[in-house]
């Protein structure tokens, strides 16, 4: 068996094309275009790359993009004041604060300062709580994008044994809620998990998000499993690798996401979808 690659890049491009058409239709109907404020604090190279990709995607689909590049020494109070201003700006439908933040700024305080109806990253406790209550509105972008990828396989998720490796607030925890909502029996593994290999081998659907290249050996993959690799790790030779040993895993899986070109583009596509949703549902 050789796994089919799930082409996140192509699927994300299709979503962006559809969004561009919807934005054009809004303009023709005399409605304003959706607006996204992107806030970057500091000069972390990886964050700068991510923010640049998000801003370019905004412009591609015709959104209003507001950029705020703040110095590393920006105080927490100054950042919160900027968020307050964006909260009250009628041209802005979504606010994104790129994480991680400098150590002197408390991330939870910043996330909770963003109005839930403008929380297009889906990190606010209100929006995570909506997902937990099975009434999602603005959903965490990476898990949302992963669910879109899984749907393209045509495989029915109801009754599948799903295993998530990694329990972060950004991916692992909301991912478990998404898969629970999709009818899976979910297991979330983390640093204290015992017998990780045994749990991974039982997974019909495996999502790995730990940030360690090749962390999951390919021979652990159950024959016919769907493998979603969230990891983006830069190796010493400059190449990118995922958290799963791709070649060996491809011999067992039925579907697998490549790195790069799998989950990454879908995160940005989901961010754009959330921004349009916020404009249509909350601010029109």
From Swiss-Prot:
Single GO biological process annotation from the record: L-histidine biosynthetic process
Annotated Pfam families: THF_DHG_CYH, THF_DHG_CYH_C
InterPro entries registered for this protein in UniProt: Aminoacid_DH-like_N_sf, NAD(P)-bd_dom_sf, THF_DH/CycHdrlase, THF_DH/CycHdrlase_cat_dom, THF_DH/CycHdrlase_CS, THF_DH/CycHdrlase_NAD-bd_dom
Superkingdom, taxonomy of origin: Bacteria
Pathway in which the depicted protein is active: One-carbon metabolism; tetrahydrofolate interconversion
Keyword line: Amino-acid biosynthesis, Histidine biosynthesis, Hydrolase, Methionine biosynthesis, Multifunctional enzyme, NADP, One-carbon metabolism, Oxidoreductase, Purine biosynthesis
Assigned EC number: 1.5.1.5, 3.5.4.9
Chaperone keyword on record: no
GO CC, alphabetical: cytosol
Reaction(s) this enzyme catalyzes, per UniProt: (6R)-5,10-methylene-5,6,7,8-tetrahydrofolate + NADP(+) = (6R)-5,10-methenyltetrahydrofolate + NADPH; (6R)-5,10-methenyltetrahydrofolate + H2O = (6R)-10-formyltetrahydrofolate + H(+)
GO molecular function, one term: methenyltetrahydrofolate cyclohydrolase activity
Residue positions binding NADP(+): 166-168, 232
PANTHER family in the record: C-1-TETRAHYDROFOLATE SYNTHASE, CYTOPLASMIC (PTHR48099:SF5), C-1-TETRAHYDROFOLATE SYNTHASE, CYTOPLASMIC-RELATED (PTHR48099)
Family according to the record: Belongs to the tetrahydrofolate dehydrogenase/cyclohydrolase family.
Chain's role: Catalyzes the oxidation of 5,10-methylenetetrahydrofolate to 5,10-methenyltetrahydrofolate and then the hydrolysis of 5,10-methenyltetrahydrofolate to 10-formyltetrahydrofolate.
Subunit structure, as described in the record: Homodimer.
Protein name: Bifunctional protein FolD
Lineage: Bacteria, Pseudomonadati, Pseudomonadota, Gammaproteobacteria, Alteromonadales
The gene coding this protein: folD
